[in-house]
Swiss-Prot record:
It catalyses: Random endo-hydrolysis of N-acetyl-beta-D-glucosaminide (1->4)-beta-linkages in chitin and chitodextrins. Residues 561-583 form a propeptide. This is Chitinase 2. GO terms for molecular function: chitin binding; chitinase activity; endochitinase activity. Belongs to the glycosyl hydrolase 18 family. Chitinase class III subfamily. The gene is CHT2. Residues 1-19 form the signal peptide.
Length: 583
């Protein structure tokens, strides 16, 4: 088995050919999401396409099968689809300089591993049927794909790191070409199905789905979170793609103007590589006034937002100044932060479980495990001084005098958590707005209440400072001021969240949280009293509408049908022709 260093070296070599480009377009093909899907070779004739992802190998490990909607119907004796035309087109695409990856998983399919051993063994199957190995039943005949993409959206996370590692070992045996590994996580970080794979195996690309979730481009776009992950990823050179829908009837779609604004903010990130599109059929139908398809439009956006590197002298000066400031700040505050960790964790776990489940509800919703704060509805700042200190010592911020002051900041924020809301056997990912109260500095307490109130929340913070058995109360009240966006840790996956039915009301809830911290001879007690009037939850605008689009957005993960109320939908997701007769 290859060592981790060998795997990393292989990943770096494989991605070197594409590493310098930040204007690449990756295109998912195979699911006929918008109808009228043409054969693969036609899309590869488009010069602006750089990477093709064949979607999907959606049944594995046993039974094993692929699904390319209207593009493959012949089978081997075993029932495995035999797609000779696609095999010929793969070689055509590769001759035109396209990278062709086979994507595993998708939103519709039956796949996953019960144990690590079966996942590791499955690498042999993939290599022999789609790679440079040998097998009597090869769906693409003698065509060899350039690697594999993991678009795992259900079925658990077991075995995927081991499978990817085993595939890297297979790649090392064939030096005739470069091979690639990629993943297509949904934008909430970390991804429930692909988190382990991304954190344990050096991958070349991540095609992040910035749609169907609260973190889409027209929502709380969290590319920065993924860039920070990439900084510490097993492959430090991993390239990130911003995944967007190619047609306006899919939730999270943005036009080229909004896409350009988003790219403008991230274009100089060292990990940014381009945009991935779902899917090919839709991209060719989505034309502008010039008749250019969406792939060309996106490539133009990327070319127009090329990063211009600053001069070397200016960069050096800025780096030196920043380093000095950060070092000084860390030295002053690190001791206080370390001391508060244990107390905070206990308070969060207890209060979160008690409050989130207290509201009445007509349905139970499962929280995905990620939350991000929006603009704050209120923030107030107060300073409490230990006995014997003076105001100047607390506010100068220099030398050892700063350590004597205990600063209390109360922050009333709005937070969006994503839950799965189910009704009549239909489930959608739904962002729900909740409230969060934060008291920071020595102590940090997160108290989440659901749903958000329809008016301002009053928070009373009572601080008591004790020195040599003498205690002096020092109350602090909040005012309502805006606060920039931040990210906080969400509730653990599996937490059940309830919320009232629209049209109902509830009474007043009071939440009291107390924590204490001792610094030297001083002990500070902080009590939060939150009075919240619970009001009906409105259906989130990101779910109820799709911007200016008058059609109801279709909530579909990759592999799901993208056109609603159409008999053609069956052909988008069902590989067997007999299924159509049910309609």
């Amino acid at each position: 088995m290859l060592s981790f260093k060998s795997l990393l070296a292989a990943a770096v070599v494989a991605s070197s050919a594409l590493a310098s480009a930040s204007n690449q377009v990756a295109l998912y093909w195979g699911q006929n999401g918008a109808g009228g899907q043409e054969r693969l070779a036609q899309y590869c004739q488009e010069a602006d396409v750089d990477i093709i992802l064949l979607s999907f190998l959606n049944l594995f490990p046993d039974p094993l099968n692929v699904n390319f909607a209207n593009q493959c119907g012949n089978t081997f004796e075993s029932g495995l689809l035999h797609c000779s035309q696609i095999g010929a087109d793969i070689k055509t695409c590769q001759s035109l300089g396209k990278t062709v990856l086979l994507s595993l998983g998708g939103g519709v399919g039956d796949y996953g591993f019960s144990d690590v051993a079966s996942a590791t063994k499955f690498a042999d199957t993939l290599w022999n049927k789609f790679g440079a190995g040998e097998d009597p039943e090869r769906p693409f005949d003698d065509a060899v794909v350039d690697g594999f993409d993991f678009d795992i959206e259900h079925g658990g996370a077991t075995g995927y790191p081991e499978l990817a590692t085993a595939l890297r070992g297979k790649f090392a045996k064939d030096t005739s070409k470069n091979y690639f590994l990629s993943a297509a996580p949904q934008c909430p970080y970390p991804d429930a199905s692909l988190g382990d794979l991304l954190s344990k195996v050096p991958l070349d690309f991540a095609f992040i789905q910035f749609y169907n979730n609260y973190c889409s481009i027209n929502g709380q776009f969290n590319y920065d979170t993924w860039s920070k992950f990439a900084d510490s990823a097993p492959n430090k050179n991993i390239k990130l793609f911003v995944g967007v829908p190619a047609t306006s009837n899919i939730a999270g779609y943005v036009d080229t103007s909004k896409l350009s604004s988003a790219i403008e903010e991230i274009k100089c990130d060292s990990h940014f590589a381009g945009v991935s599109l779902w899917d090919a059929s839709g991209a060719w139908l989505n034309t502008d006034e010039k008749g250019e398809n969406f792939v060309v439009q996106v490539k133009n956006v990327l070319n127009q937002n090329a990063c211009v590197a600053p001069s070397s002298s200016a960069t050096t000066q800025s780096t030196t100044t920043t380093s000095s400031a950060v070092t000084q700040s860390t030295t002053t505050t690190s001791a206080a932060i370390t001391q508060s960790a244990t107390t905070t964790s206990a308070a969060v776990a207890t209060k979160s479980n008690q409050i989130v489940t207290s509201s009445s509800s007509s349905s139970s919703s499962i929280f995905y495990g990620n939350s991000t704060t929006e603009s704050s509805t209120g923030i107030a700042t107060g300073t409490v001084l230990p006995t014997g200190s003076n105001e100047n010592a607390a506010t100068t911020g220099s030398g050892s005098n700063t350590k004597l002051a205990i600063s209390t900041v109360t922050d009333v924020q709005k937070t969006v958590i994503t839950i799965t809301s189910c009704s009549e056997h239909k489930c959608v990912a739904t962002p729900v707005t909740t409230g969060v109260v934060v008291v920071t500095d020595i102590d940090t307490v997160y108290t989440t209440y659901c749903p958000l109130t329809n008016s301002q929340v009053y928070v009373s913070v009572k601080t008591v400072v004790c020195t040599e058995e003498t205690c002096v109360p020092s109350p602090t009240s909040t005012s309502q001021k805006p606060k920039a966006s931040t990210t906080i840790k969400g509730v653990e996956k599996g937490q059940t969240t309830s919320y009232p039915v629209v049209g109902t009301t509830e009474g007043v809830k009071k939440i009291v949280t107390t924590s204490a911290q001792t610094v030297g001879s001083s002990t500070k007690y902080v009590t939060i009293e939150l009075t919240s009037t619970i009001t009906p939850v409105t259906y989130p605008t990101s779910v109820a509408s799709n911007g200016t689009n008058t059609t109801v957005p279709v909530f579909t993960f990759e592999g799901g049908a993208a056109v609603a109320n159409s008999l053609n939908s069956v052909w988008f997701t069902v590989p067997f022709l007999l299924a159509a007769f049910a309609f």
